[in-house]
A protein has these predicted regions:
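Active-site bordering "gate/hinge" segments
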Residues: 1-255
Length: 257
């Protein structure tokens, strides 16, 4: 288990955060000082001032995954056998399949969030993740197909998910689709409508507007590492980019239809 304290402050309508894994009073007080100082500095460039009475309300509640059987009922061999069946069926589907990978991940996460504003939220989540990926190659062309991309096949469930999962059928389908991609004609060079599957749509939004809206990139702090951004500070609240159906806001209380 991991422990820590996150200090959340608001100064002049500006939020700031700082955290420490050390629970000694000295480190907690240092966190407060740093968070307050950062909020004061950031408030000079604030694009939106929050109202203290409208945010960080003291909610209470509990949640746990609805499951039939705990994940602890599964042994290491159960997981190993499942991964082996997945990769074996993908590799054996066609001689043009040159690579197959199966990832099985089980997560038991217990989180309790207690805040000085009265919040007390207890969450117990059991998560099952199964990733299948198959790569087909013919001469100089190769194509990869997966079951909805990285972490695209992720569920809140118990051991019953693994016990009922027909990985053999899905593995063969993944390799079949990889072969279909390999045999498909090249896309024509023309202007046309593009339909994105959910995994590609998430990645498209993530790369095209997600990273550019990161303040460290906008301010130039990441220029020598991950890159900069085409967004400027003066663009906040005015820049229109992309479809009207897509909107990204920091205020999660706003409702968009």
């Amino acid at each position: 288990a991991t422990k820590g304290v996150m200090i959340d402050v608001m100064v002049n309508g500006q939020f700031s955060y700082y955290a420490t894994p050390f629970l000694d009073e000295k480190y907690i007080l240092d966190c407060i000082d740093i968070a307050v100082n950062n909020a004061q500095l950031a408030s000079k460039f604030s694009v939106f001032k929050f109202d203290h009475d409208e945010v960080r309300k003291g909610y209470e509640g509990s949640y746990k995954t609805n499951l039939k059987s705990p994940l602890s009922n599964l042994s290491v061999n159960d997981i190993k056998d499942l991964a082996f069946i997945g990769s074996k069926n993908m590799m054996n589907f066609d001689k043009r399949i040159i690579h197959a990978a199966t990832t099985v991940e089980l997560i038991e996460r217990n989180t309790r969030i207690v805040s000085t504003n009265g919040a007390d939220i207890d969450q117990k989540m059991d998560i099952v993740l199964v990733e299948l990926s198959s790569t087909a190659q013919d001469k100089n062309d190769s194509q990869t197909r997966s079951n909805h991309g990285m972490r695209g096949h992720c569920f809140q469930a118990g051991a019953e998910f693994i016990e009922d999962y027909d990985i053999e059928t899905e593995a063969k389908q993944i390799s079949h689709q990889a072969i279909e991609l390999l045999e498909a004609d090249q896309c024509p060079t023309e202007v046309c409508d593009l339909v994105l599957a959910p995994d590609q749509m998430m990645l498209q939004i993530h790369e095209s507007v997600g990273h550019p809206l990161e303040l460290d990139r906008i301010l130039g702090d990441e220029r020598n590492f991950a890159g900069s951004s085409f967004v400027n500070l003066e663009d906040f609240g005015t820049l229109k980019y992309g479809s009207e159906l897509m909107n990204i806001v920091f205020d999660l209380s706003l409702i968009h239809i």
